[in-house]
């Protein structure tokens, strides 16, 4: 089993021989996620067994890739496999080189450690001293079971299958050999390399369309330096060439060279035990070669510029599909079928494209399905409605869905990807076509109904009043608007490249239906015009009236004061300014309304009614804005700003810095009284120039004779104008009732008092400072006591506990409650003491004689009464006690 101990005693190798970070009891990758296990997070952090010794593939490989954040890296990953004879230190090399934790062999019991194929992610991401020498991202390392082991004996079936699997998936094949094995056949793994060459012919030479390459990276261990690396390299190349020449190759490739399909790299490492420091240094240098690079002609770079990961080595399998691809390859290998990698890639592409298609359609369904359900429900109810932003939603959903599919699936087989994309687009377009057709039907019905009603009403009104109007202009204009609306909706549904989104025939049918409709359009247009003008008046009044109220009493940089510092107009003429602004705004609105109404060829009566309604509506807007400004919170804030401008700043607009010598009380009283005079001013809408109420009835005018009762339904009664409502002009112009005025005065005074108290505190705080020399004097006089406390453990610990208690109390904001409790307790204690003393004097004969007091009834001396205290610890008054009892 993969989790068995390396030796029967469960003991480690000697301290000299073992890897410094190895566990005390060495196991064969016991902490990895093995085949058949329920993997844990800790196991995934170390690695995973891809294939066990029974040739079973691990179905959790994709989960491991997701756990290591490799599955989403696309093509930005690299796969390395290591080959070599059993017990030659392959796992040890990988652990040092990539920071992995593969199980290593115990010298006490020379037996097989690695069974099957194991994988772990590189953990030495920063091997290089500089950024240019940093190892590549997402390096996956496969530790392949060693060859020539006594456990399998002459059974080379797994050896051949594992070599075939590694070659089909890996970019770099590391061959781990010892220096003294160079020149041997079995010792130098030439038998294994012959197997690699044979499976390479089986895999790639049959595919004449491409020439995949792989890198054979020879790591020569225990290199003493007596034989130069170049000589060892030449020997290995000669042996490899001889093996390649002896292979039986496909027709037409008999004269091919080994260099056409393989690149070679070489590295030498010193003895791990005899030269441990140098071994670690050379391994770190070797790690810097595992990064992206390209071919180089310079000999000193060993044929590579930058690193050994060349683009042509990559198998071009996206990381999220690697587990499926690897499992398919292994199934083919185990079943002893001819491994056809192009077919495997197509199968992988079909599987992944279908899977990706289902995933992206989930997002598409989330956006489109609610719209489909709404449209179906409206159709069943007989009231089809136009769904807002359907065109942009459909177009965006289609584009994003296809784009997401393209982003993930385009990395797979191009032919399969193109076919699956066409299928996906067909599914999307079928649903959008039905949805868009229903949208246009709803737009058609609602548009025709709206147009028909509008034109019919316009005709009836013209016939009733015998007024002249250009019906053709009205119909043409409304028709143009309706057509434009339909056209806009149709264009919003258009998708470039899709012929079925050209809705010209539906547009022609819609235009034909509009040509059959007539109605009374002008009145509707007049009402819409009135609404637009009223909205404009509301917008203008909201801004201008708000500015006037913001100027309220702000003598310098208040919220409404100009930036230049000039004082605004007097506070007394506030209502005059508001009335003038209101009249000017409405006059401008009347001009706009009249000009626009004449362009509709409206009658004088219609214009008169419209202007009459405009004035009444505008007054309602003004009253609503005034009521909003004098709401309790708003007006109180403005009064506070007015008070603070006068209290906190001098006549020149300079902020006051309070000192004890300042006449804070006088300034406060003056500012407060000045602000209080504003409240009566604000309570009634009265013009200061004439000292009278505005002539609202005269300004609005009498009700036009041609007014329609329907025109008065939405109008609010106005005091002094609509006398039948029983509300006078005086009541209409009252802004603040007497009760609100009194309440506002009380609230403002409380607010002003708070500002005053704050100013007094700031003035007192400026002088309540302890002189600095006092601290030096305190330190000098109390030095002996400080030393005594610090040297006495009891005092020192007590001091620390007091400090901790004080800090906790301060952090929890408990000082206030504690002080109030102490004050209350002390006050209560004094009262009880006085009461007991009074009882003693009354009960004592000498005390009575001295005080001339009458004896008291001893029957009432048993109880001690407790007084009711207020929040400050004072004795509460009798009235407060009675209220407390109620």
UniProtKB/Swiss-Prot annotation:
Q: Which organism is it from?
A: Botryotinia fuckeliana (strain B05.10) (Noble rot fungus)
Q: Name one GO biological process term.
A: endoplasmic reticulum membrane fusion
**Any idea which positions bind GTP?**
84-91
Main localization of the protein?
Answer: endoplasmic reticulum
Q: Among its keywords, does the record have Nuclease?
A: no
Q: Which residues, by range, are in coiled-coil regions?
A: 502-527, 722-743
What is this enzyme's EC? 3.6.5.-
Query: Where does the record place the GB1/RHD3-type G domain?
Result: 74-313
Could you give one GO CC term from the UniProt record?
endoplasmic reticulum membrane
Provide the residue span(s) of the region labelled Disordered.
Answer: 372-399, 851-886
Which segments does the topology annotation call Cytoplasmic? 1-769, 815-886
Q: What is this protein called?
A: Protein sey1
The GO terms describing molecular function are: GTP binding; GTPase activity
Record's function text? Cooperates with the reticulon proteins and tubule-shaping DP1 family proteins to generate and maintain the structure of the tubular endoplasmic reticulum network. Has GTPase activity, which is required for its function in ER organization.
Q: Which Gene3D superfamilies does the record cross-reference, listed alphabetically?
A: P-loop containing nucleotide triphosphate hydrolases (3.40.50.300)
Its placement in the membrane is given as: Multi-pass membrane protein
InterPro entries reported for this sequence: G_GB1_RHD3_dom, P-loop_NTPase, RHD3/Sey1, Sey1/RHD3-like_3HB
Places the protein is found: Endoplasmic reticulum membrane
């Amino acid at each position: 089993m993969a989790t068995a101990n390396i030796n029967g005693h469960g003991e480690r190798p000697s301290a000299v021989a073992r890897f410094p970070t190895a566990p005390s009891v060495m196991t064969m990758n016991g902490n990895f996620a093995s085949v058949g296990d329920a993997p844990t997070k800790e196991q995934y952090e170390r690695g995973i067994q891809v294939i066990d010794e029974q040739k079973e593939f691990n179905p959790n490989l994709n989960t491991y890739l997701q756990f290591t954040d490799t599955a989403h890296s696309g093509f930005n990953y690299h796969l390395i496999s290591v080959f070599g004879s059993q017990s030659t230190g392959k796992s040890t090399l990988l652990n040092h080189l990539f920071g992995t934790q593969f199980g290593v062999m115990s010298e006490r019991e020379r037996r097989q450690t690695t069974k099957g194929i194991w994988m772990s992610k590189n953990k030495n991401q920063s091997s290089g001293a500089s950024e240019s020498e940093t190892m590549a991202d997402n390096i996956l390392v496969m530790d392949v079971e060693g060859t020539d082991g006594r456990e399998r004996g002459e059974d080379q079936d797994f050896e051949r299958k594992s070599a075939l699997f590694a070659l089909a998936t890996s970019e770099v094949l590391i061959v781990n050999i010892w220096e003294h094995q160079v020149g041997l056949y079995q010792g130098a793994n030439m038998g294994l390399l012959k197997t690699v060459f044979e499976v390479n012919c089986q895999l790639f030479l049959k595919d004449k369309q491409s020439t995949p390459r792989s890198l054979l990276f020879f790591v020569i261990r225990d290199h003493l330096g007596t034989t130069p690396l170049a000589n060892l390299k030449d020997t290995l190349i000669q042996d490899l060439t001889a093996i390649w020449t002896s292979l039986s190759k496909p027709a037409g490739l008999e004269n091919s060279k080994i260099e056409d399909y393989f690149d070679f790299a070489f590295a030498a490492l010193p003895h791990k035990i005899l030269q441990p420091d140098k071994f670690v240094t050379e391994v770190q240098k070797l790690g810097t070669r595992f990064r992206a690079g390209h071919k180089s002609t310079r000999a000193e770079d060993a044929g590579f510029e930058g690193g050994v990961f060349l683009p042509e080595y990559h198998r071009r399998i996206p990381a999220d599909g690697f587990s499926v691809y690897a499992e398919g390859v292994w199934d083919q290998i185990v079943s002893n079928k001819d491994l056809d990698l192009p077919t495997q890639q197509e199968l992988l592409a079909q599987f992944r494209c279908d899977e990706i298609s289902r995933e992206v359609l989930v997002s598409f369904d989330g956006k489109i399905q609610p719209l489909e359900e709404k449209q179906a429900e409206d159709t069943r109810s007989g009231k089809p409605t136009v769904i807002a932003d359907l065109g942009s939603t459909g177009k965006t959903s289609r584009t994003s869905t296809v784009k997401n599919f393209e982003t993930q699936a385009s990395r797979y087989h191009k032919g399969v990807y193109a076919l699956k994309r066409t299928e996906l687009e067909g599914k999307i377009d079928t649903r959008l076509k039905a949805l868009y057709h229903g949208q246009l039907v709803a737009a058609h019905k609602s548009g025709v109904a709206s147009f028909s009603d509008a034109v019919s009403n316009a005709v009836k009104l013209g016939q009733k009043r015998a007024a002249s109007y250009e019906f053709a202009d009205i119909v043409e204009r409304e028709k143009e608007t309706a057509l434009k609306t339909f056209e806009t909706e149709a264009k919003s549904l258009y998708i470039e490249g899709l012929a079925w989104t050209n809705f010209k025939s539906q547009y022609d049918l819609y235009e034909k239906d509009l040509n059959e409709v007539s109605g009374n359009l002008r009145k509707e247009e007049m009402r819409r015009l009135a609404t637009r003008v009223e909205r404009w008046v509301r917008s203008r009044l909201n801004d201008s009236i708000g500015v006037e109220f913001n100027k309220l009493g702000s003598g310098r940089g208040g919220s409404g004061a100009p930036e230049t510092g000039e004082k605004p107009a007097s506070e007394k003429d506030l209502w005059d300014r508001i009335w003038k602004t209101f009249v000017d705004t409405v006059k401008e609105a009347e001009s706009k309304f009249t000009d626009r109404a004449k362009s509709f060829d409206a009658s004088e009566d219609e214009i008169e009614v419209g202007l009459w309604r405009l004035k009444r509506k505008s007054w309602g807007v003004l009253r609503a804005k005034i009521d909003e400004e004098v709401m309790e919170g708003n007006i109180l804030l403005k009064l506070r700003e007015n008070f603070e401008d006068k209290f906190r700043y001098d006549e020149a607009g300079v902020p006051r810095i309070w000192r004890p010598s300042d006449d804070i009380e006088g300034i406060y009283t003056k500012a407060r009284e000045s602000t209080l005079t504003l409240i009566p001013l604000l309570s009634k809408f009265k013009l200061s120039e004439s000292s009278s109420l505005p002539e609202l009835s005269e300004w609005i005018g009498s009700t036009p004779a041609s007014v329609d009762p329907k025109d008065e339904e939405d109008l609010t009664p106005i005091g002094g104008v609509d006398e039948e409502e029983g509300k006078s002009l005086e009541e209409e112009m009252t802004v603040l009732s007497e009760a609100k005025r009194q309440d506002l005065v009380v609230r403002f005074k409380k607010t002003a008092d708070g500002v005053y108290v704050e100013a007094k505190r700031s003035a007192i705080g400026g002088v309540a400072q302890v002189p600095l020399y006092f601290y030096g004097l305190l330190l000098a006089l109390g030095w002996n006591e400080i030393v005594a406390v610090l040297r006495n453990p009891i005092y020192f610990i007590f001091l620390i506990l007091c400090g901790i208690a004080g800090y906790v109390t301060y952090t929890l904001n408990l000082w206030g409650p504690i002080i109030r409790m102490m004050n209350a307790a002390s006050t209560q204690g004094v009262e009880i003491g006085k009461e007991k003393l009074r009882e003693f004097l009354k009960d004592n004969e000498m005390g009575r004689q001295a005080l001339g007091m009458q004896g008291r009834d001893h029957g009432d001396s048993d109880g001690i009464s407790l007084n009711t205290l207020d929040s400050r610890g004072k004795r509460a008054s009798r009235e407060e006690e009675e209220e407390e009892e109620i």
